[in-house]
Amino acid sequence: VYMYMFAWESPVMDGILRSTHCMEIPLVFNNVVRHASMTGGGKAAQVLADKMSSAWLNFARTGNPNTEGLPEWEPYTADKGATMIFDNDCGMKYNHDKELLEVVMTFPVRGF
C-alpha cells in the first residue's frame, strides 16, 4: 500500500481553489492543458503531472510507484506512515497528520 497527499495549489482564480478535492485527477492522467480551468495549464502543473502520471503508470505496471524525478516512495505501514506529498517540491513525510487521525478515530462510528 502506498499513501499520498496532494498539496499542490492551483493558481486558477488567484489561487482560491487551493488544493481542492479531485484536483489531482488531471495531473495523474497528464491532462493539465485540457483541464486548464482547474490547473491553470502552466509549467508547474505540467512538471508535477509528468511525475505523478509516471508514478501511477509504474504502479499499474509493476505494483511499485517509484519513478525518476521523485524521492523514493516507501510503502505505507502503521508504524511509519510513509506518505508522498505531491507539490512543487515532492517529498516523503512520516506519520503525516498523526495527531489529527487519532482525534478522528475517537469519533463515534455510525452506519451509512
Language-model regions, residue ranges each:
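C-terminal helix-and-tail extensions that cap enzymatic domains
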Residues: 1-112
